[in-house]
Structure formats: C-alpha cells, structure tokens
C-alpha cells in the first residue's frame, strides 16, 4: 500500500518529540500493620491453628529469614473474625475476598494517585491515559473505571486494566506507559499499581509449605506515577527518564513460580530454585539492555531490584558482584513493607530519588546517570527497564 508523504507526516505529528519521563511518584499503604517478629503468634492465633506447634516453629524460622520488620495489611483481626473462612486453608472464600478487594483496591490506588498528582502540580483534567494493575479484586467494570470516578477524572480518559500479572508488573507498567507517552503527543499517563495480600491470606497446612512462605512475605500497598514526554518548562519537573524497556521469560520457568486463582483464594507455588534461576538469567537481560550503550560494569548503575525475597536479593548481588550499597534501597523497602508485588519496585524507585535528594547527591539516581529497574514474577517473567536520572 502506498503511503503519501502528507500521511507519513501526519503520523509523526502525533508522536512526542522526546522520550518518556517520570514526572511524579506517590505511594500509599493501609493504616493497619503487623510486626514480623510477633506475626507467627498472631497468624496461628487468628487462624485457630495454635495446636500445630511444630508448624508454627517452622513458620517462625521462615519469618526470621525474610529480613522483614513490618508489613501493612487490609485484613485486621476484626475483619478476620467476621469472615472466618478467610482463616481456613481450603474453604471456599473467593466471594468474600472479592467483596473486600473490589472496594478497597481502588481506594488504595486513589491515595497513591492523589499524592502523585499533588507532586506533579498540574490539573488532573490533563491526564489523558490511565494504566491500572492489580492481582486482586477482578471485576467488570474494573478498578480502572472505579478509580476514574474516585478521582473525578474525565470519562474519556483512555484506560488499560491489567489483572493477574504478579510481581514483575511494576516494570510492565513503565514499559506500557513509555509507549503511550511517546506515541501520543501531549499524553500524560497515570500509572497505578495497587496490591493486597488479602487475595491469598489462608490458614496454615502441614502439607503446604509454599503457603507459609507467601504468608511470611507479602504486604499491601499502592504506587502511582505520572509519566509523559516533553515536560512543560517551569511547570513539570522530571524525576527519571525511561530510556528503554523490555520483557522476557525463562523457558520452563513456570514450574518454579506460579500463582493460581481458586475458590479458596490465590494459591502460591514456589520452588527453592527460584533465587538461583533468577540470578542466573538476570545478566543476559542486562547485557542485552546495556551492551549498545557500551556499559558492562553493573556497579556503575543505580539499582531498583524487585525484592521477591531476601534469598533472591542476596543471590543477584553475589552473582553480579554488586557492592553492598547497590541494593540498599531494595532491602530497605523489603524490610519496611515486605513484598508488595507489582508496586514494590515503584516504592524502591521513590526511595532512591528521595534518598538522593536527602543526601545531596548530584542526580536523582544515587548521583549516577544510568540505572536499571529489574522486576520478575510468575513465568519466570523478567522486565528490564533502563532509567536515566536527572540533575537535582
């Protein structure tokens, strides 16, 4: 088919001139939180499982190895008392989980979004696109539509709802938002990741150690970003530039890490091979992303690594020969919030830029120019996002 010059110029006129940039970041968590040291006692008490003495001790050891101090959660003891099937290991409880999360996930997303919009400082009427991600509360119309109403956005905002993605999806959201911002001149994309462990909270079972790992690891939280190209001088101040973004998965990786939505909630399967498998496959992703830039020293980058668990962080650090300061922000977020699934790496991104400003660094990326965001999850899917910092 022949393409006329005028037609081609028209297509290019619809594209932004510059690369996508993160213009603001906001985060939010539920008010209720649990202390990790005392959580084994709490968990076995609220699930009426105190008779499982040996299993409780095993859970205590698992919790102590997570390097988590506290986690925020929607599920309070009062809510669990009112909905006892949530405390069972196998009783059907999906309807109750849905009722809770369909309401709470958009509200949590709203809190983070309002913080991002406030930092951005521009009218919310100029938001053109919304990308919402959660593994919780699948519904139609979805959390994206509910958030538009909660924020009072235009009904004409272009929406994309991503359900059931998992821990890698923080990187996915940046990749999708980059494409939207760069291919739609003047676009301002609101990205929201809101997650809750309530979808998978279950009582313990001696036959299911994987469940104990999930109960020790996941927390609740939401992160929101405003992303756009060609920032308005004097009105918009970029935080990071999204230089490139790519996705891949490890062949046969789904046998190592998978989650399944069942009548008893979201079930979790994880093998001991997850940390070494991720660590072994990360460097090939880095080489593909940074070889064109002439970079092979991974310590020359600032790092946002999704903390799937402490063992993963340790093995990636060891395999790549990273200095102890490189994954400090990752460990801080894991310690203070637990694994927040898709929102987690965005919390770390926020931590990096705040720490850089607090410590008087030259740039928003620990004083360095280039960095990498790596997120991974079911599949084993890996997202690799190259970021450029901005001067502070």
From Swiss-Prot:
GO biological process: flavonoid biosynthetic process; polyketide biosynthetic process
Coiled-coil spans in chain: none
EC category name: transferase
Tissues in which the UniProt entry reports expression: Expressed at low level in seedlings after illumination with UV light. No expression in flowers or tissue culture.
Catalytic activity: (E)-4-coumaroyl-CoA + 3 malonyl-CoA + 3 H(+) = 2',4,4',6'-tetrahydroxychalcone + 3 CO2 + 4 CoA
Molecular function in Gene Ontology: naringenin-chalcone synthase activity
Record keywords: Acyltransferase, Flavonoid biosynthesis, Transferase
Short name of any one Pfam family annotated for the protein: Chal_sti_synt_C
Active site: residue positions: 167
EC numbers: 2.3.1.74
Pathway where this protein functions: Secondary metabolite biosynthesis; flavonoid biosynthesis
Functional description taken from the UniProt entry: The primary product of this enzyme is 4,2',4',6'-tetrahydroxychalcone (also termed naringenin-chalcone or chalcone) which can under specific conditions spontaneously isomerize into naringenin.
Family classification: Belongs to the thiolase-like superfamily. Chalcone/stilbene synthases family.
Annotated protein name in UniProt: Chalcone synthase B
Organism: Petunia hybrida
Encoding gene, per UniProt annotation: CHSB
